[in-house]
C-alpha cells in the first residue's frame, strides 16, 4: 500500500510517478483522524486502508475486493483531503469524474458517499500491463494460493518420484482449487502432473512439476442499467 503525498491536491496527482508492481496499490487522498490523545491529525491513506482490508477479511475472503459500500468503509477517519500550501487540511469529496480520472491512472480513490460515509472506491494495483493481477483481489488470491500450494507440496519432498506420488499431489491440488471455486475465488482451473510435464530428464534431476492454470473471479466495478420506455401494451406483446 502506498499513498500519494498528502500535501498535494488532486490537480497533479496523476503526474506523480510510482513504482510499477502487481502487489502495490496507491490510494488518494489522505485522511483526517485523531491520535491516542484525542488530537486531530492528518494521516496517509494507508492508515485507513490497512484497517479496511483487515475488516474486509473478517467478513469475507482475501479474494473479495476490499472496496465499495459493503467492505470498503473507512472507519478510523472523519474526512478525506490534503494539506494545502498554508499547512491547513482541505477536505475533498471526490465526484464521479474525479474518481474516474484517478482510477484510470491506477490510483484508488477514497471518497465520501451519502449514506455510507468514507469509502475506498478502488482496487487497482500498479501492474505495468493489463492482466488479472492489475486488481487487488486477484493479487491477494495469488498470494494466498502460493502459500497454500507451498504447504501442500512440502510433505512430498523426498517421496518416490513416481505415478503414485504424482497422482497424490495432483489430487491434493484439485481438492484445494475445487474448494476455492466454491468460495468464489475461481471460475475454473486445470492441474497437470503426469508424464507430459514430468519427463525422464526432469525425474533424473529429482524434480517434480505440478502445473496449474487458474481463471480468477473478477470483481464488478461498473454496472450498466439501460432504461427503455415502451408504448402502452407493447411490453405485454413481447
Predicted regions, residues:
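Structured, hydrophobic secondary-structure cores that serve as assembly/anchoring elements
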Residues: 2, 7-238
Amino acid at each position: 500500500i502506498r499513498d500519494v503525498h498528502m500535501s498535494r491536491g488532486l490537480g497533479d496527482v496523476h503526474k506523480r510517478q510510482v513504482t510499477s508492481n502487481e502487489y502495490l496499490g496507491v490510494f488518494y487522498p489522505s485522511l483526517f483522524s485523531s491520535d491516542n490523545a484525542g488530537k486531530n491529525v492528518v494521516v496517509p491513506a494507508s492508515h485507513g486502508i490497512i484497517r479496511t482490508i483487515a475488516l474486509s477479511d473478517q467478513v469475507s475472503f482475501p479474494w473479495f475486493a476490499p472496496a465499495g459500500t459493503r467492505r470498503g468503509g473507512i472507519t478510523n477517519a472523519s474526512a478525506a483531503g490534503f494539506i494545502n500550501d498554508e499547512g491547513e487540511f482541505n477536505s475533498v469529496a471526490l465526484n464521479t469524474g474525479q474518481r474516474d480520472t484517478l482510477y484510470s491512472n491506477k490510483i484508488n480513490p477514497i471518497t465520501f458517499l451519502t449514506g455510507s460515509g468514507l469509502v475506498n472506491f478502488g482496487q487497482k494495483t500498479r501492474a505495468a500491463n493489463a492482466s488479472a493481477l492489475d486488481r487487488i483481489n486477484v493479487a491477494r488470491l495469488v498470494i494466498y494460493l502460493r502459500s497454500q500450494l507451498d504447504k501442500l507440496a512440502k510433505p512430498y519432498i523426498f517421496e518416490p518420484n513416481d505415478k503414485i506420488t504424482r497422482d497424490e499431489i495432483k489430487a491434493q491440488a484439485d481438492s484445494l482449487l475445487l474448494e476455492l471455486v466454491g468460495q468464489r475465488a475461481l471460475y475454473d482451473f486445470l492441474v497437470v502432473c503426469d508424464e507430459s510435464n514430468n519427463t525422464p530428464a526432469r525425474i533424473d534431476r529429482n524434480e517434480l512439476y505440478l502445473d496449474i492454470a487458474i481463471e480468477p473471479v473478477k470483481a464488478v466495478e461498473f454496472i450498466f442499467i439501460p432504461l427503455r420506455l415502451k408504448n402502452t401494451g407493447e411490453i405485454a406483446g413481447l
